[in-house]
From Swiss-Prot:
Catalyzed reactions: GTP + H2O = GDP + phosphate + H(+)
GO CC, alphabetical: cytosol
The protein's assembly and partners: Monomer.
Region listing for G1, in residue ranges: 19-26
Protein family according to the UniProt entry: Belongs to the TRAFAC class translation factor GTPase superfamily. Classic translation factor GTPase family. EF-Tu/EF-1A subfamily.
Cited function: GTP hydrolase that promotes the GTP-dependent binding of aminoacyl-tRNA to the A-site of ribosomes during protein biosynthesis.
Name of the protein this chain belongs to: Elongation factor Tu 1
Disulfide bonds: none
Pfam families documented for this protein: GTP_EFTU, GTP_EFTU_D2, GTP_EFTU_D3
E.C. number(s) listed in UniProt: 3.6.5.3
Region described as G5: spans on this chain: 175-177
Annotated spans, G4: 137-140
Residue span of region G3: 82-85
């Protein structure tokens, strides 16, 4: 039996379920796979306990349990992540282990919004999950129409509070458990309705090749008579020979350079694109003027910064993290892309200290500027070991 060929005829979208513990995220994930399998004959039906026993993965030195399922609608191919525990969600969203183009917020109609409902919406805002669709679950347990409307209003208010368009967000009322029991019935229709909403509300993500060019510099050589070569893996976009690009980071202002060649596996190319490991030949710069930790990028697309707000997860002792809390003014190394930069942290007002296992919003100031933008992931390290993970939430300067 040969491996089934992966058909990439439909647009691909990454989504995930978020929401409070026991509100039905995993049941909904199982119900989606079964309903989609029944209605469209695509993907495999995945049972609840298979999703619940999610395998552990390591991302940036942090162990996270995540379940991955995939399925298709008429219009799209979806890769869907579901996490068993709240801590896994926090870690997953902050490390970007499972990048989401949009999320399904699952909220129990019987309980209404709970603390983790709020926290997952806040995390989505902080880490840059751009779109949320709401599934009000367990509606079979609520007879009172007014109560359903009340819960819907509460969820919409919560979305508005964290700068999501709460008034316009699609809210689907259903029952994951009932859909699981009878995917062909009326509760199964609600799953289809959910995906009609997702197909339209969550836009197709911009492909990596369509984004502005960026390549973190990993190594630098000089080739006699030809100039300086910077090597690395192109993170996004396309770079062409004779194009003007900028060198950003570790100095106050970006420096403009001209690409005189792109090499891959010792062959000369006209261009390099996202995912390629290349050497970029640069005119007008000496080997000692460019170093690991800087990035080559489309001019004007990214700037060097030293100060920003970040959402951070601090590793527990069992995860190889610190055994003790840290305080305001803590000075670790921040590992961005390819290099460590020292910086200091400022805790929010009223927060005395941060314990291992916490997640928190903090202000970070680096001693040298790094090419930074919202959504950029980093690790926090002490003496070469990872003690935390973070994501840039907003730039200060």
């Amino acid at each position: 039996m040969g491996k089934a060929k992966f058909e990439r005829s439909k647009p691909h979208v990454n989504i995930g379920t978020i929401g409070h513990v026991d509100h039905g995220k995993t049941t909904l994930t199982a119900a989606i796979t079964i309903t989609m399998h029944n209605r469209y004959g695509t993907g495999g039906a995945v049972a609840f306990d298979m999703i619940d026993k999610a395998p552990e993965e390591r991302e940036r030195g942090i162990t996270i349990s995540t379940a991955h399922v995939e399925y298709e609608t008429d219009k799209r191919h979806y890769a869907h992540v579901d996490c068993p525990g709240h801590a896994d969600y926090v870690k997953n969203m902050i490390t970007g282990a499972a990048q989401m183009d949009g999320a399904i917020l699952v909220c129990s109609a019987a309980d209404g919004p709970m603390p983790q409902t709020r926290e997952h919406i806040l995390l989505s805002r902080q880490v840059g999950v751009p779109y949320i669709v709401v599934f009000l679950n367990k509606c079979d347990m609520v007879d009172d129409e007014e109560l359903l409307e009340l819960v819907e209003m509460e969820v919409r208010d919560l979305l508005n509070m964290y700068e999501f368009p709460g008034d316009d967000t699609p809210v689907i009322m259903g029952s994951a458990l009932k859909a699981l029991e009878d995917p062909a019935g009326p509760w199964g229709d609600k799953i289809v309705e959910l995906f009609d909403a997702i197909d339209t509300w969550i836009p197709e993500p911009v492909r990596d090749t369509d984004k502005p060019f960026l390549m973190p510099v990993e190594d630098v050589f000089s080739i006699t008579g030809r100039g300086t070569v910077a090597t690395g893996r192109i993170e996004r976009g396309i770079v062409k020979v004779q194009e003007e690009i900028s060198l950003v980071g570790l100095s106050e202002a970006p420096r403009k350079l001209v690409v005189t060649g792109v090499e891959m596996f010792r062959k000369l190319l006209d261009q390099g694109q996202a995912g390629d490991n290349v050497g970029i030949l640069l005119r007008g710069i000496q080997r000692d003027e460019i170093e690991r930790g800087q990035v080559l990028a489309k001019t004007g697309s990214i700037q060097p910064h030293t100060k920003f707000m970040a959402e951070v997860y601090v590793l527990k002792k069992e995860e190889g993290g610190r055994h003790t809390p840290f305080f305001d003014g803590y000075r670790p190394q921040f590992y961005f892309r390819t290099t460590d930069v020292t910086g200091s942290i400022k805790l929010p007002e009223g927060v005395e200290m941060v314990m291992p296992g916490d997640n928190i919003t903090m202000e970070i100031e680096l001693i040298s500027p790094i090419a930074t933008e919202e959504g950029l992931r980093f690790a926090i390290r002490e003496g070469g070991r990872t003690v935390g993970a973070g994501v840039v939430a907003s730039i200060i300067e």
